Amino acid sequence: MSLRILTNIYLTKDEGGIKQMKVLLLFSSADIGGAERSLSRMALSNDDDAVSYQLSTFGSYGVWSEWVASAGGVPICFDKRVWKLLKYIFTEKPDAIYIIGFRLAVLLRVITPFISKSFLVQGVRWNPNSNSMLDKTFRFVEWLFGSLLDGYIVNSNSARLNLNKLVKKNIELIYNGIADIQPINSKKSDNKNIIITIANLSVRKGYEDYLRAIAIVVNKVPESRFLFLGKDNLDGKIQQLIIDNNLENSVQYLGFQEKIDEFLENSAVFVLPSLYGEGCPTSILEAFSFSLPVVAYQIDGIPELVTHGVDGLLFDVGDVNALADGIINLLLDPEKSTKMGISGYQKVKDYFLLNDMVKKHNDYFLRLK
């Protein structure tokens, strides 16, 4: 699919008397995670003249901006300067501001009405149902000030149900989508011992528990090899735990990788050990697109993607022994693993394509006009 190259200045078109809907897609972070990847791909893949997306970050030029530029986009960076952001909104007058980031959404819902008539839409890319301070604050603020937004877009039904308890606004459910579905890899059996995880290193991603499970797996399947891909937000803690648990020969941390296809192509099983705070993980859909079975905890939006025993294995959160047994089961039964991977592959083809994600976003924003 050809990419629409976006510029810093919106192109306003009147086709058939209909003015183009201009959407400022604004990320609070300059880093790149599942939300940044999936929504940026959505915006870059849009070819509907009725809607245009300007990609931007409240942060500075960095990993995400470079990634967008490499894909043909022209991102705007506001360098954490509120005045720069407000000046842009006042000058360019986007029809809608699609905000990804809770704190930034709070700020804009207070200030923006004084300078702009832009619709304010908050993207909630996780299920805010945990006891973390962030989630508690989120629930309180949305209950109190949710009326100042024009709407929400969530990417999991679990998030929609929880948000529905707090606000009366219309909440739109749009799952993530994948653009390129790879042909089924007939050589997966050659990579039967490689287990991959794509997730930034953070507390909620559950890497500490995962290392305990890995120690059990390695004891039963010594030839197994584990790959960790993602930005380190724990200042080397996980790398030190790998050393402390004598897992250096079994676990390799590769940091953030802009291109992940080759790693997925050469893996047999995908594991996402998140403990809480998931919506519709893009990494799971990417794993399915490469015919990988998924092993994860049964939390938040993950069961909406993974069907236990069909295209993956789901376990109670924190059950390290069960997580380890699930991985071992797939490593020792490659036929079962392959069958599950093919089921996941078919699920993505049927229900989680990027074109559908783009269309649903466009339809939503056009309804705001």
Describe each model-derived feature in a short phrase:
Residues H308-G309, L313-V320, N329-P334:
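Conserved acidic donor-binding segment of nucleotide-sugar-dependent glycosyltransferases
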Residues L234-K237, E248-Q257, F263, L313-L314:
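Active-site donor-binding acidic/aromatic loop of nucleotide-activated sugar
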Residues E265-G279, L292:
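Acidic donor-binding loop of glycosyltransferase active sites
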Residues G33-L44, N193, N200-I216, N233-Q239, ...:
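A conserved mid-protein helix/loop that constitutes part of the nucleotide-sugar donor-binding site
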Residues L25-W83, N162-N164, L173, D232-D235:
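N-terminal strand-loop element at the rim of the active site
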Residues S158, G177:
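Carbohydrate-associated surface elements
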Residues P293-A296, V306:
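Short hydrophobic beta-strand element within catalytic cores of glycosyltransferases
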Residues I99-L107, V124:
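Short His-centered aromatic/hydrophobic patch
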